[in-house]
Amino acid sequence: MTHPESERRAREVRRASAEAMNAYNATVPFNAWLGAEVVSADHEGVRLKVPWRVEFGGAPGMTHGGILAGIIDLSAYMALMAEKGGAGPTIDMRIDYHRSVVNGTLFTFAKLLRVGATISTVEVVVHDAEQRLIASGRCVFLSQGRKRAPDALPVDA
């Protein structure tokens, strides 16, 4: 289920600025909880900064993989928002975990690999403050506005 305010904001924003993306993130509860800040958005890609918190912990001495996956998914979505105002849902995501991190700010860089009529693909890397690779991922999104008509859904759905 989507948040009505976040849907409205996504429709309003095309080729969004970092400021507009941060305002959008404040309307999405999970994004706001992550505390990510879009620090730049340009033709090369989008950069986010995420201050580490104790709530990000998984096993002792490690950040929970779901947190890193969420940060990667958010970063990828922000890259699409910067280019075309948003995207549909994530339909595939692959994450590689390279190094554990227990504290300190995380930094992401997301770049568009392909923006198509039906799907879009974004590559994301996550680094720590020392530029060590923490995780990387690739997200595939259904293009915004491409929804099946309700009568086209299978009867069993």
Regions found by a protein language model. Give the residues of each.
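Terminal targeting signals and extreme-terminal segments of soluble enzymes
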Residues: 1-157
